[in-house]
């Protein structure tokens, strides 16, 4: 487990992509760059020169807080954080990034999700089949654990 490579995508709302990018840049002590494109993306480099992206996701029901009330927000409040290729030692960094984003108004709702991509180079077909079967049989338990 500790020698696997992975990537993570975390969907959120409550703050704009620009504010999320500035939060991430502040965390890393770098700067945010608006790269635009079809996902209206922002890019932030970390100390290892890896690029973290903040992109839009059309499936997110955008919201923000106004005077303590959660209200509908425009599409700039659709935020998906896309990590670079990560390793086990990055788990603490990811936790701290999420905390920083939450301190700056990030929130989630039922339209938000987390996607974890695990490098397959260490798994043969039987391993992949076993993992798929475990995930399928424990899907409800995993879902409850993430709520």
Regions found by a protein language model. Give the residues of each.
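Phosphate/nucleotide-binding catalytic core
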Residues: 1-147
